[in-house]
Protein backbone atom coordinates (compact mmCIF):
# COMPACT_ATOMS: atom_id res chain seq x y z
CA UNK A 1 0.00 0.00 0.00
CA UNK A 2 1.45 3.38 -1.02
CA UNK A 3 0.80 6.64 0.73
CA UNK A 4 0.46 9.77 -1.35
CA UNK A 5 2.88 12.33 0.10
CA UNK A 6 0.73 15.24 -1.12
CA UNK A 7 -2.13 13.99 1.08
CA UNK A 8 0.20 14.02 4.09
CA UNK A 9 1.45 17.54 3.31
CA UNK A 10 -2.03 18.85 2.51
CA UNK A 11 -4.59 16.76 4.41
CA UNK A 12 -8.29 17.36 3.54
CA UNK A 13 -8.85 19.24 6.80
CA UNK A 14 -6.09 21.73 5.91
CA UNK A 15 -7.45 22.22 2.38
CA UNK A 16 -10.96 22.72 3.77
CA UNK A 17 -9.58 25.24 6.26
CA UNK A 18 -7.93 27.24 3.46
CA UNK A 19 -11.09 27.09 1.36
CA UNK A 20 -13.15 28.21 4.36
CA UNK A 21 -10.83 31.19 4.92
CA UNK A 22 -11.12 32.15 1.24
CA UNK A 23 -14.93 31.97 1.26
CA UNK A 24 -15.04 33.92 4.54
CA UNK A 25 -12.88 36.61 2.93
CA UNK A 26 -15.07 36.87 -0.18
CA UNK A 27 -18.41 36.35 1.60
CA UNK A 28 -17.97 37.05 5.35
CA UNK A 29 -21.73 36.90 6.08
CA UNK A 30 -22.81 34.10 8.43
CA UNK A 31 -25.81 31.92 7.55
CA UNK A 32 -28.13 33.36 10.20
CA UNK A 33 -27.25 36.93 9.06
CA UNK A 34 -28.00 36.45 5.36
CA UNK A 35 -31.62 37.71 5.40
CA UNK A 36 -30.70 40.73 7.53
CA UNK A 37 -27.73 41.61 5.30
CA UNK A 38 -29.65 41.16 2.04
CA UNK A 39 -32.59 43.30 3.16
CA UNK A 40 -30.26 46.10 4.36
CA UNK A 41 -28.39 45.78 1.06
CA UNK A 42 -31.63 46.08 -0.94
CA UNK A 43 -32.65 49.14 1.10
CA UNK A 44 -29.26 50.77 0.53
CA UNK A 45 -29.34 49.95 -3.19
CA UNK A 46 -32.77 51.59 -3.64
CA UNK A 47 -31.77 54.73 -1.71
CA UNK A 48 -28.47 55.14 -3.58
CA UNK A 49 -29.98 54.43 -7.00
CA UNK A 50 -32.58 57.14 -6.33
CA UNK A 51 -29.82 59.46 -5.10
CA UNK A 52 -27.79 59.11 -8.29
CA UNK A 53 -30.82 59.51 -10.58
CA UNK A 54 -32.11 62.69 -8.93
CA UNK A 55 -28.62 64.18 -8.66
CA UNK A 56 -28.15 63.78 -12.39
CA UNK A 57 -31.66 65.06 -13.11
CA UNK A 58 -31.36 68.19 -10.94
CA UNK A 59 -28.14 69.20 -12.72
CA UNK A 60 -29.67 68.43 -16.12
CA UNK A 61 -32.73 70.62 -15.48
CA UNK A 62 -31.05 73.59 -13.79
CA UNK A 63 -27.97 73.71 -16.05
CA UNK A 64 -29.85 73.50 -19.36
CA UNK A 65 -33.06 75.37 -18.44
CA UNK A 66 -31.79 78.13 -16.11
CA UNK A 67 -28.00 78.29 -16.42
CA UNK A 68 -24.92 76.68 -14.85
CA UNK A 69 -24.09 79.95 -13.08
CA UNK A 70 -27.19 79.59 -10.88
CA UNK A 71 -25.91 76.38 -9.23
CA UNK A 72 -23.60 78.33 -6.90
CA UNK A 73 -26.59 80.49 -5.84
CA UNK A 74 -28.73 77.41 -5.17
CA UNK A 75 -26.01 75.70 -3.14
CA UNK A 76 -25.39 78.68 -0.84
CA UNK A 77 -28.72 80.53 -0.73
CA UNK A 78 -31.04 77.53 -1.15
CA UNK A 79 -29.54 74.20 -0.07
CA UNK A 80 -27.62 75.37 3.01
CA UNK A 81 -30.54 77.11 4.82
CA UNK A 82 -32.87 74.25 3.80
CA UNK A 83 -30.46 71.73 5.36
CA UNK A 84 -30.49 73.67 8.65
CA UNK A 85 -34.31 73.85 8.52
CA UNK A 86 -34.57 70.12 7.82
CA UNK A 87 -32.28 69.35 10.77
CA UNK A 88 -34.49 71.43 13.10
CA UNK A 89 -37.64 69.66 11.83
CA UNK A 90 -35.98 66.26 12.28
CA UNK A 91 -35.05 67.03 15.91
CA UNK A 92 -38.71 67.97 16.58
CA UNK A 93 -39.94 64.74 14.97
CA UNK A 94 -37.53 62.61 17.02
CA UNK A 95 -39.12 63.88 20.23
CA UNK A 96 -42.68 63.18 19.04
CA UNK A 97 -42.69 60.11 16.79
CA UNK A 98 -41.46 56.51 16.61
CA UNK A 99 -38.28 55.94 14.61
CA UNK A 100 -40.08 53.74 12.08
CA UNK A 101 -42.79 56.34 11.44
CA UNK A 102 -40.20 59.10 10.96
CA UNK A 103 -38.65 57.06 8.15
CA UNK A 104 -42.02 56.49 6.44
CA UNK A 105 -43.04 60.15 6.79
CA UNK A 106 -39.84 61.68 5.40
CA UNK A 107 -39.51 59.21 2.51
CA UNK A 108 -43.20 59.70 1.63
CA UNK A 109 -42.81 63.50 1.52
CA UNK A 110 -39.84 63.20 -0.87
CA UNK A 111 -41.67 60.72 -3.11
CA UNK A 112 -44.87 62.80 -3.13
CA UNK A 113 -42.89 65.83 -4.31
CA UNK A 114 -41.14 63.83 -7.05
CA UNK A 115 -44.51 62.49 -8.27
CA UNK A 116 -46.01 65.99 -8.24
CA UNK A 117 -43.02 67.38 -10.14
CA UNK A 118 -43.07 64.62 -12.78
CA UNK A 119 -46.79 64.58 -13.58
CA UNK A 120 -48.08 68.05 -12.66
CA UNK A 121 -45.38 70.69 -12.27
CA UNK A 122 -42.91 69.95 -15.08
CA UNK A 123 -45.51 69.31 -17.83
CA UNK A 124 -47.07 72.70 -16.94
CA UNK A 125 -43.92 74.64 -16.06
CA UNK A 126 -44.48 77.27 -18.76
CA UNK A 127 -47.83 78.19 -17.14
CA UNK A 128 -46.47 78.08 -13.58
CA UNK A 129 -43.34 80.15 -14.25
CA UNK A 130 -43.03 83.85 -15.02
CA UNK A 131 -43.11 84.74 -18.70
CA UNK A 132 -39.76 85.47 -20.43
CA UNK A 133 -40.88 89.09 -21.07
CA UNK A 134 -41.58 89.68 -17.35
CA UNK A 135 -38.21 88.17 -16.42
CA UNK A 136 -36.44 90.31 -19.00
CA UNK A 137 -38.06 93.49 -17.64
CA UNK A 138 -37.21 92.60 -14.04
CA UNK A 139 -33.57 91.80 -14.80
CA UNK A 140 -33.22 95.02 -16.81
CA UNK A 141 -34.42 97.08 -13.81
CA UNK A 142 -32.61 95.02 -11.13
CA UNK A 143 -29.43 93.99 -12.91
CA UNK A 144 -27.45 92.93 -9.81
CA UNK A 145 -30.29 90.61 -8.76
CA UNK A 146 -30.42 88.99 -12.21
CA UNK A 147 -29.54 85.45 -11.02
CA UNK A 148 -31.94 85.54 -8.08
CA UNK A 149 -34.71 86.66 -10.43
CA UNK A 150 -33.93 83.78 -12.81
CA UNK A 151 -34.08 81.27 -9.96
CA UNK A 152 -37.34 82.64 -8.58
CA UNK A 153 -38.92 82.95 -12.03
CA UNK A 154 -38.30 79.21 -12.54
CA UNK A 155 -39.10 78.39 -8.92
CA UNK A 156 -40.10 74.76 -9.50
CA UNK A 157 -36.71 73.87 -11.03
CA UNK A 158 -34.95 75.60 -8.13
CA UNK A 159 -37.14 73.76 -5.62
CA UNK A 160 -36.45 70.42 -7.31
CA UNK A 161 -32.70 71.09 -7.11
CA UNK A 162 -32.91 71.88 -3.38
CA UNK A 163 -35.08 68.83 -2.56
CA UNK A 164 -32.80 66.54 -4.60
CA UNK A 165 -29.74 67.92 -2.76
CA UNK A 166 -31.39 67.18 0.60
CA UNK A 167 -31.97 63.49 -0.22
CA UNK A 168 -28.36 62.27 0.40
CA UNK A 169 -28.04 64.23 3.66
CA UNK A 170 -31.47 63.41 5.09
CA UNK A 171 -32.39 59.98 3.72
CA UNK A 172 -29.02 58.32 3.21
CA UNK A 173 -26.67 59.89 5.78
CA UNK A 174 -29.27 60.38 8.52
CA UNK A 175 -32.20 57.95 8.23
CA UNK A 176 -30.44 54.98 6.61
CA UNK A 177 -27.16 55.03 8.52
CA UNK A 178 -28.78 55.77 11.87
CA UNK A 179 -31.10 52.79 11.36
CA UNK A 180 -28.28 50.47 10.24
CA UNK A 181 -25.88 51.57 12.99
CA UNK A 182 -28.58 50.86 15.59
CA UNK A 183 -29.34 47.32 14.39
CA UNK A 184 -25.76 46.26 13.59
CA UNK A 185 -23.24 45.11 16.19
CA UNK A 186 -19.57 46.20 16.09
CA UNK A 187 -18.56 42.67 15.07
CA UNK A 188 -21.16 42.59 12.26
CA UNK A 189 -20.17 46.05 11.03
CA UNK A 190 -16.59 44.90 10.34
CA UNK A 191 -17.96 42.30 7.91
CA UNK A 192 -21.02 44.15 6.55
CA UNK A 193 -19.72 47.66 5.87
CA UNK A 194 -16.93 46.90 3.35
CA UNK A 195 -19.51 45.06 1.22
CA UNK A 196 -21.87 48.04 1.55
CA UNK A 197 -19.09 50.26 0.14
CA UNK A 198 -18.65 48.01 -2.87
CA UNK A 199 -22.42 47.93 -3.39
CA UNK A 200 -22.71 51.73 -3.38
CA UNK A 201 -20.27 51.99 -6.29
CA UNK A 202 -22.21 49.30 -8.18
CA UNK A 203 -25.31 51.48 -7.72
CA UNK A 204 -23.49 54.47 -9.22
CA UNK A 205 -22.47 52.40 -12.25
CA UNK A 206 -25.98 50.99 -12.87
CA UNK A 207 -27.61 54.42 -12.49
CA UNK A 208 -25.11 55.77 -15.00
CA UNK A 209 -25.90 53.00 -17.48
CA UNK A 210 -29.64 53.68 -17.13
CA UNK A 211 -29.17 57.41 -17.83
CA UNK A 212 -26.85 56.74 -20.78
CA UNK A 213 -29.63 54.68 -22.41
CA UNK A 214 -32.41 57.13 -21.51
CA UNK A 215 -33.06 58.19 -25.13
CA UNK A 216 -33.49 54.56 -26.22
CA UNK A 217 -35.82 53.87 -23.27
CA UNK A 218 -37.77 57.02 -24.16
CA UNK A 219 -38.20 55.89 -27.79
CA UNK A 220 -39.31 52.42 -26.68
CA UNK A 221 -41.93 53.78 -24.24
CA UNK A 222 -43.23 56.29 -26.83
CA UNK A 223 -43.67 53.61 -29.51
CA UNK A 224 -45.02 50.97 -27.13
CA UNK A 225 -47.76 53.15 -25.61
CA UNK A 226 -48.24 55.68 -28.46
CA UNK A 227 -47.61 58.61 -26.10
CA UNK A 228 -47.93 62.23 -27.21
CA UNK A 229 -45.83 63.84 -24.43
CA UNK A 230 -42.83 65.97 -25.35
CA UNK A 231 -39.55 64.05 -25.51
CA UNK A 232 -37.94 65.81 -22.52
CA UNK A 233 -41.08 65.70 -20.37
CA UNK A 234 -41.30 61.96 -20.96
CA UNK A 235 -37.59 61.51 -20.11
CA UNK A 236 -38.10 63.25 -16.77
CA UNK A 237 -41.25 61.21 -16.11
CA UNK A 238 -39.40 57.95 -16.86
CA UNK A 239 -36.57 58.83 -14.44
CA UNK A 240 -38.95 59.90 -11.67
CA UNK A 241 -41.22 56.89 -12.21
CA UNK A 242 -38.21 54.65 -11.58
CA UNK A 243 -37.49 56.80 -8.50
CA UNK A 244 -41.06 56.25 -7.24
CA UNK A 245 -40.92 52.48 -7.83
CA UNK A 246 -37.58 52.22 -6.00
CA UNK A 247 -38.96 54.42 -3.21
CA UNK A 248 -41.94 52.10 -2.71
CA UNK A 249 -39.58 49.08 -2.70
CA UNK A 250 -37.43 50.88 -0.09
CA UNK A 251 -40.47 51.51 2.15
CA UNK A 252 -41.60 47.87 1.82
CA UNK A 253 -38.06 46.62 2.53
CA UNK A 254 -37.82 48.83 5.61
CA UNK A 255 -41.19 47.50 6.84
CA UNK A 256 -40.08 43.87 6.32
CA UNK A 257 -36.84 44.55 8.19
CA UNK A 258 -38.77 45.99 11.12
CA UNK A 259 -41.56 43.42 11.26
CA UNK A 260 -40.26 40.17 9.75
CA UNK A 261 -36.45 40.07 9.70
CA UNK A 262 -35.25 41.72 12.91
CA UNK A 263 -36.07 40.13 16.25
CA UNK A 264 -37.40 41.95 19.31
CA UNK A 265 -33.88 42.32 20.68
CA UNK A 266 -32.84 44.33 17.64
CA UNK A 267 -36.00 46.41 17.70
CA UNK A 268 -35.41 47.40 21.33
CA UNK A 269 -32.14 48.99 20.19
CA UNK A 270 -33.83 50.99 17.45
CA UNK A 271 -34.43 54.52 18.57
CA UNK A 272 -33.42 57.50 16.50
CA UNK A 273 -31.84 60.15 18.66
CA UNK A 274 -30.78 63.68 18.09
CA UNK A 275 -27.01 63.89 18.45
CA UNK A 276 -25.89 64.61 21.96
CA UNK A 277 -24.85 68.22 22.35
CA UNK A 278 -23.17 68.72 19.02
CA UNK A 279 -20.48 71.39 18.87
CA UNK A 280 -21.49 74.91 17.92
CA UNK A 281 -19.67 76.75 15.12
CA UNK A 282 -17.83 78.90 17.72
CA UNK A 283 -16.73 75.80 19.68
CA UNK A 284 -15.57 74.16 16.45
CA UNK A 285 -13.42 77.19 15.57
CA UNK A 286 -11.90 77.16 19.08
CA UNK A 287 -11.04 73.47 18.76
CA UNK A 288 -9.43 74.00 15.34
CA UNK A 289 -7.40 76.99 16.54
CA UNK A 290 -6.14 75.08 19.58
CA UNK A 291 -4.72 72.09 17.63
CA UNK A 292 -2.40 72.33 14.60
CA UNK A 293 -3.18 68.71 13.72
CA UNK A 294 -6.93 69.39 13.54
CA UNK A 295 -6.29 72.70 11.77
CA UNK A 296 -4.45 70.88 8.98
CA UNK A 297 -7.21 68.25 8.60
CA UNK A 298 -9.79 71.05 8.35
CA UNK A 299 -7.58 72.71 5.70
CA UNK A 300 -7.64 69.51 3.62
CA UNK A 301 -11.45 69.40 3.74
CA UNK A 302 -11.81 73.10 2.89
CA UNK A 303 -9.36 72.86 -0.02
CA UNK A 304 -11.08 69.77 -1.45
CA UNK A 305 -14.51 71.43 -1.35
CA UNK A 306 -13.27 74.67 -2.94
CA UNK A 307 -11.14 72.99 -5.64
CA UNK A 308 -13.89 70.60 -6.79
CA UNK A 309 -16.53 73.36 -6.94
CA UNK A 310 -14.21 75.71 -8.86
CA UNK A 311 -13.84 73.15 -11.66
CA UNK A 312 -17.40 71.78 -11.61
CA UNK A 313 -19.07 75.12 -12.41
CA UNK A 314 -17.13 75.91 -15.63
CA UNK A 315 -17.22 72.22 -16.63
CA UNK A 316 -21.03 72.06 -16.39
CA UNK A 317 -21.30 75.38 -18.24
CA UNK A 318 -19.05 74.04 -21.02
CA UNK A 319 -21.16 70.87 -21.22
CA UNK A 320 -24.31 72.88 -22.02
CA UNK A 321 -22.69 74.02 -25.30
CA UNK A 322 -23.00 70.46 -26.62
CA UNK A 323 -25.65 68.84 -24.39
CA UNK A 324 -28.41 71.45 -24.65
CA UNK A 325 -31.47 69.56 -23.39
CA UNK A 326 -32.19 67.80 -20.07
CA UNK A 327 -32.25 64.38 -21.81
CA UNK A 328 -28.90 64.87 -23.56
CA UNK A 329 -27.33 66.29 -20.41
CA UNK A 330 -28.68 63.41 -18.27
CA UNK A 331 -27.14 60.88 -20.69
CA UNK A 332 -23.82 62.73 -20.45
CA UNK A 333 -23.97 62.68 -16.63
CA UNK A 334 -24.87 58.98 -16.84
CA UNK A 335 -21.64 58.26 -18.70
CA UNK A 336 -19.69 60.22 -16.08
CA UNK A 337 -21.40 58.29 -13.23
CA UNK A 338 -20.61 54.92 -14.84
CA UNK A 339 -16.92 55.72 -15.06
CA UNK A 340 -16.93 57.10 -11.50
CA UNK A 341 -18.35 53.80 -10.24
CA UNK A 342 -15.76 51.72 -12.12
CA UNK A 343 -12.77 53.85 -11.06
CA UNK A 344 -13.92 54.00 -7.44
CA UNK A 345 -14.02 50.19 -7.28
CA UNK A 346 -10.50 50.21 -8.77
CA UNK A 347 -9.31 52.70 -6.13
CA UNK A 348 -10.95 50.59 -3.38
CA UNK A 349 -8.87 47.59 -4.51
CA UNK A 350 -5.63 49.59 -4.84
CA UNK A 351 -6.15 51.93 -1.89
CA UNK A 352 -5.39 49.60 1.01
CA UNK A 353 -2.26 48.30 -0.75
CA UNK A 354 -0.97 51.84 -1.35
CA UNK A 355 -1.35 52.75 2.33
CA UNK A 356 0.17 49.47 3.49
CA UNK A 357 3.12 49.40 1.07
CA UNK A 358 3.91 53.07 0.41
CA UNK A 359 2.72 54.77 3.60
CA UNK A 360 0.23 57.44 4.67
CA UNK A 361 1.75 60.41 2.80
CA UNK A 362 1.82 58.71 -0.62
CA UNK A 363 -1.82 57.67 -0.27
CA UNK A 364 -2.88 61.10 1.06
CA UNK A 365 -1.09 63.15 -1.62
CA UNK A 366 -2.57 61.24 -4.59
CA UNK A 367 -5.98 63.01 -4.43
CA UNK A 368 -4.65 66.62 -4.38
CA UNK A 369 -2.18 65.75 -7.16
CA UNK A 370 -4.94 64.24 -9.31
CA UNK A 371 -7.25 67.23 -8.69
CA UNK A 372 -4.42 69.72 -9.37
CA UNK A 373 -3.02 68.16 -12.57
CA UNK A 374 -6.37 67.37 -14.21
CA UNK A 375 -7.83 70.72 -13.05
CA UNK A 376 -4.94 72.67 -14.60
CA UNK A 377 -5.41 70.73 -17.85
CA UNK A 378 -9.13 71.61 -17.86
CA UNK A 379 -8.57 75.32 -17.22
CA UNK A 380 -5.76 75.43 -19.81
CA UNK A 381 -8.02 73.98 -22.52
CA UNK A 382 -10.99 76.10 -21.41
CA UNK A 383 -9.04 79.39 -21.33
CA UNK A 384 -6.26 79.14 -23.91
CA UNK A 385 -7.08 78.34 -27.54
CA UNK A 386 -3.44 77.56 -28.33
CA UNK A 387 -3.34 74.79 -25.75
CA UNK A 388 -6.61 73.35 -27.07
CA UNK A 389 -5.12 73.48 -30.59
CA UNK A 390 -2.09 71.52 -29.41
CA UNK A 391 -4.35 68.77 -28.09
CA UNK A 392 -6.44 68.80 -31.31
CA UNK A 393 -3.23 68.25 -33.30
CA UNK A 394 -2.31 65.16 -31.27
CA UNK A 395 -5.65 63.54 -30.47
CA UNK A 396 -8.82 62.37 -32.22
CA UNK A 397 -11.06 65.09 -30.72
CA UNK A 398 -11.42 68.12 -33.00
CA UNK A 399 -13.90 70.34 -31.13
CA UNK A 400 -12.27 72.58 -28.44
CA UNK A 401 -15.51 72.55 -26.40
CA UNK A 402 -15.62 68.74 -26.49
CA UNK A 403 -11.97 68.58 -25.37
CA UNK A 404 -12.73 70.82 -22.37
CA UNK A 405 -15.78 68.72 -21.47
CA UNK A 406 -13.85 65.44 -21.79
CA UNK A 407 -10.92 66.63 -19.66
CA UNK A 408 -13.39 68.09 -17.13
CA UNK A 409 -15.17 64.73 -16.98
CA UNK A 410 -11.85 62.90 -16.48
CA UNK A 411 -11.00 65.41 -13.73
CA UNK A 412 -14.30 64.81 -11.94
CA UNK A 413 -14.20 61.02 -12.31
CA UNK A 414 -10.64 60.66 -10.99
CA UNK A 415 -11.11 63.31 -8.27
CA UNK A 416 -14.33 61.80 -6.92
CA UNK A 417 -12.98 58.22 -7.15
CA UNK A 418 -9.80 59.02 -5.24
CA UNK A 419 -11.73 61.18 -2.75
CA UNK A 420 -14.21 58.41 -1.87
CA UNK A 421 -11.33 56.01 -1.18
CA UNK A 422 -7.82 57.41 -0.58
CA UNK A 423 -8.73 60.89 0.69
CA UNK A 424 -11.47 59.73 3.07
CA UNK A 425 -9.48 56.80 4.47
CA UNK A 426 -6.25 58.77 5.04
CA UNK A 427 -8.21 61.61 6.61
CA UNK A 428 -9.79 59.16 9.09
CA UNK A 429 -6.38 57.59 9.75
CA UNK A 430 -5.00 61.01 10.69
CA UNK A 431 -7.33 61.08 13.73
CA UNK A 432 -6.27 57.67 15.08
CA UNK A 433 -3.07 58.56 17.04
CA UNK A 434 -4.64 61.61 18.72
CA UNK A 435 -5.63 61.92 22.37
CA UNK A 436 -9.20 60.49 22.80
CA UNK A 437 -10.77 63.86 23.67
CA UNK A 438 -9.08 65.71 20.78
CA UNK A 439 -9.94 62.79 18.48
CA UNK A 440 -13.69 63.04 19.21
CA UNK A 441 -14.01 66.82 19.47
CA UNK A 442 -11.44 67.49 16.76
CA UNK A 443 -13.21 65.26 14.24
CA UNK A 444 -16.53 66.97 14.96
CA UNK A 445 -14.89 70.41 14.59
CA UNK A 446 -13.03 69.58 11.37
CA UNK A 447 -16.11 67.98 9.80
CA UNK A 448 -18.36 70.93 10.69
CA UNK A 449 -15.99 73.72 9.64
CA UNK A 450 -14.07 71.94 6.88
CA UNK A 451 -17.04 70.49 5.02
CA UNK A 452 -19.27 73.56 5.40
CA UNK A 453 -16.59 76.11 4.46
CA UNK A 454 -15.38 73.99 1.56
CA UNK A 455 -18.78 73.56 -0.10
CA UNK A 456 -20.61 76.74 0.84
CA UNK A 457 -17.52 78.99 0.83
CA UNK A 458 -16.79 78.28 -2.82
CA UNK A 459 -20.47 78.66 -3.76
CA UNK A 460 -20.68 81.98 -1.88
CA UNK A 461 -17.57 83.39 -3.60
CA UNK A 462 -18.86 82.45 -7.05
CA UNK A 463 -22.36 83.82 -6.39
CA UNK A 464 -20.82 87.05 -5.06
CA UNK A 465 -18.87 87.51 -8.32
CA UNK A 466 -22.06 87.02 -10.35
CA UNK A 467 -23.96 89.52 -8.14
CA UNK A 468 -21.25 92.18 -8.55
CA UNK A 469 -20.80 91.41 -12.27
CA UNK A 470 -24.28 90.36 -13.47
CA UNK A 471 -23.19 90.09 -17.10
CA UNK A 472 -20.39 87.66 -16.19
CA UNK A 473 -20.43 83.97 -17.12
CA UNK A 474 -18.24 81.05 -16.13
CA UNK A 475 -16.32 81.48 -19.37
CA UNK A 476 -15.56 85.15 -18.67
CA UNK A 477 -14.35 84.56 -15.08
CA UNK A 478 -12.61 81.25 -15.80
CA UNK A 479 -9.07 82.69 -15.55
CA UNK A 480 -9.85 84.17 -12.11
CA UNK A 481 -11.23 80.81 -11.00
CA UNK A 482 -8.08 79.11 -12.31
CA UNK A 483 -5.83 81.37 -10.19
CA UNK A 484 -7.91 80.65 -7.06
CA UNK A 485 -7.83 76.95 -7.98
CA UNK A 486 -4.01 76.91 -8.22
CA UNK A 487 -3.63 78.69 -4.85
CA UNK A 488 -6.13 76.27 -3.27
CA UNK A 489 -4.37 73.14 -4.58
CA UNK A 490 -0.90 74.38 -3.56
CA UNK A 491 -2.28 75.07 -0.06
CA UNK A 492 -3.79 71.57 -0.05
CA UNK A 493 -0.46 69.96 -1.01
CA UNK A 494 1.39 71.99 1.65
CA UNK A 495 -1.20 71.00 4.30
CA UNK A 496 -0.84 67.31 3.34
CA UNK A 497 2.95 67.52 3.72
CA UNK A 498 2.66 69.26 7.10
CA UNK A 499 -0.03 66.86 8.32
CA UNK A 500 2.27 63.94 7.48
CA UNK A 501 4.84 65.38 9.94
CA UNK A 502 2.16 65.86 12.60
CA UNK A 503 0.82 62.34 11.98
CA UNK A 504 4.27 60.75 12.41
CA UNK A 505 4.95 62.77 15.58
CA UNK A 506 1.55 61.81 17.03
CA UNK A 507 2.27 58.12 16.36
CA UNK A 508 5.62 58.40 18.20
CA UNK A 509 3.98 60.06 21.23
CA UNK A 510 1.12 57.54 21.32
CA UNK A 511 3.47 54.53 21.45
Curated annotation (Swiss-Prot):
GO cellular component terms listed in the entry, alphabetical order: plasma membrane
Keyword Nucleotide-binding: yes
Entry-linked InterPro entries: ADP_ATP_car_bac_type, MFS_trans_sf
Subcellular location: Cell membrane
Chain segments annotated as transmembrane: 34-54, 71-91, 102-122, 157-177, 192-212, 231-251, 296-316, 330-350, 361-381, 390-410, 453-473, 476-496
GO MF term (any one): ATP binding
Bilayer topology term: Multi-pass membrane protein
Keywords noted in UniProt: ATP-binding, Cell membrane, Membrane, Nucleotide-binding, Transmembrane, Transmembrane helix, Transport
Function, as annotated: Provides the rickettsial cell with host ATP in exchange for rickettsial ADP. This is an obligate exchange system. This energy acquiring activity is an important component of rickettsial parasitism.
Family: Belongs to the ADP/ATP translocase tlc family.
Protein name: ADP,ATP carrier protein 4
Organism of derivation: Rickettsia felis (strain ATCC VR-1525 / URRWXCal2)
Record lineage: Bacteria, Pseudomonadati, Pseudomonadota, Alphaproteobacteria, Rickettsiales
Primary gene name: tlcD
Amino acid sequence: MTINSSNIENPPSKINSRFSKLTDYIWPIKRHEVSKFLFITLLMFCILFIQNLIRALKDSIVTTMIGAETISFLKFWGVMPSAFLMTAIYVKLVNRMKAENIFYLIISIFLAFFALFAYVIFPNHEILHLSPVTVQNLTANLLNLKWFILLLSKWSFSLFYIIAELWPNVVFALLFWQFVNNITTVEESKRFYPLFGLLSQTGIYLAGQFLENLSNINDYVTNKFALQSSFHTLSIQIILTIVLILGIIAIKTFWLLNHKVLDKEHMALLKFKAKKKSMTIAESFQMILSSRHIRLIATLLICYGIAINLVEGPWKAAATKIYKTPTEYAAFIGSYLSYTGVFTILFVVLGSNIVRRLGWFTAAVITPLIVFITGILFFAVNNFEGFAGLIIANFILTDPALIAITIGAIQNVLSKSSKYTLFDSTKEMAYVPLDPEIKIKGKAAADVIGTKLGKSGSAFLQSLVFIILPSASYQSISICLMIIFIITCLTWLWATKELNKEYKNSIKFSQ
